[in-house]
């Protein structure tokens, strides 16, 4: 995705290269990538709209709250999002307009395991967490028996 981001016109501000291991006593086996920040992409670019399960973020400027909502929702995915603001009430209202399974306001990865977690659109396959897990990890079978 980093190479694709460059091909799509993005500029890597930091990261984008392999990290040398071991780092902080992490074994040397494995793939390690430095956290990467990319700017200069269209908000419709693949690098900006696809789920990258790695330490990569894209930056996008906006001129209005509605433009920011449109950008956030202009993807076929919707696993999670975050809003950072000095006005928590406004952040909550903004989060309600986002098409994502979970939105963090002024925090990240803060979650009560008793609540459901999962994406919308093409993200995830349902909800896990709390009572929802029983359905998420179960397969129902309807059995009809004719009594003699």
Across the structure, where does each feature detected by a protein language model lie?
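Alpha-helical packing segments of well-folded alpha/beta enzyme cores
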Residues: 1-2
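General beta-strand structural signal in soluble alpha/beta enzymes
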Residues: 12-15, 105-107
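Short, solvent-exposed loop/turn elements at beta->coil junctions and helix N-caps
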Residues: 16-25
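Conserved C-terminal structural/oligomerization subdomain of aldehyde/semialdehyde dehydrogenase
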Residues: 25-148
């Amino acid at each position: 995705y980093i190479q694709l981001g460059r091909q799509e016109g993005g500029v890597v501000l930091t990261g984008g290269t392999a990290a040398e291991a071991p780092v902080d006593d992490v074994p040397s086996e494995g793939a390690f990538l430095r956290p990467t920040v990319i700017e200069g992409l269209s908000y419709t670019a693949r690098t900006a709209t696809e789920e990258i399960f790695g330490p990569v973020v894209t930056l996008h400027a906006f001129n209005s709250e509605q433009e920011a909502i449109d950008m956030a929702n202009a993807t076929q995915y919707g696993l999670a999002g975050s809003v950072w603001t000095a006005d928590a009430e406004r952040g909550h209202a903004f989060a309600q307009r986002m098409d994502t399974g979970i939105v963090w306001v002024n925090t990240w990865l803060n979650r009560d395991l008793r609540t459901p977690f999962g994406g919308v659109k093409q993200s995830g396959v349902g909800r896990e967490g709390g009572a929802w897990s029983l359905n998420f990890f179960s397969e129902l079978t309807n059995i009809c028996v004719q009594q003699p």
